[in-house]
Amino acid sequence: MAKEGIKLIANNKKARFDYFIEETYEAGVVLHGTEVKSLRMGKCSIKESFMRIENGEVYVYNMHISPYEKGNIFNKDPLRVKKLLLHKFQINKIVGQIQQKGYTLVPLTIYLKDSLVKMEIGVARGKKLYDKRQDIAKKDQKREAEKDFKVKNL
């Protein structure tokens, strides 16, 4: 995500730990002015958020955007349902994928691309407990190898 003109706002690490991400999409987010200002300050959480497709449109629920401090009466509800902007063929493809048993749609990251707020969403399949244990074991092995390498270089 360290590309030119992209500023990461929030990352959903738990989604990558709990799911196998099969395919990702970039979607625009429909927001009001004070929500954008709050996002630019980095006050957003997508840990507990989830997505639904209703009437051919994708919505994000429980995405918490803290109220803008100077927003007074213009502030919206922090947990307001937000609409995502995707092409019709992308939505149809996602619907076909998540109708399969075990697949769901999860928010992965939210970021600013130039001046636009974008969300990376993924079609995901849930991991079993042993898959999570394997990931933890791999992470520990990698950490140990880096530690040994660092000691040898001194």
Swiss-Prot record:
Name of a matching Pfam family: SmpB
GO molecular function: RNA binding
Keywords: Cytoplasm, RNA-binding
SUPFAM superfamilies, A to Z: Small protein B (SmpB) (SSF74982)
Cellular location(s): Cytoplasm
Chief subcellular location: cytoplasm
Gene Ontology terms: biological process: trans-translation
InterPro entries assigned to the protein according to its UniProt record, in alphabetical order: SmpB (IPR023620), SsrA-bd_prot (IPR000037), SsrA-bd_prot_CS (IPR020081)
Gene Ontology cellular component terms for the protein in this record: cytosol
Organism superkingdom: Bacteria
Family designation: Belongs to the SmpB family.
Described purpose of this protein according to its UniProt entry: Required for rescue of stalled ribosomes mediated by trans-translation. Binds to transfer-messenger RNA (tmRNA), required for stable association of tmRNA with ribosomes. tmRNA and SmpB together mimic tRNA shape, replacing the anticodon stem-loop with SmpB. tmRNA is encoded by the ssrA gene; the 2 termini fold to resemble tRNA(Ala) and it encodes a 'tag peptide', a short internal open reading frame. During trans-translation Ala-aminoacylated tmRNA acts like a tRNA, entering the A-site of stalled ribosomes, displacing the stalled mRNA.
HAMAP family cross-referenced by the UniProt entry: SmpB
Name of the protein in its database record: SsrA-binding protein
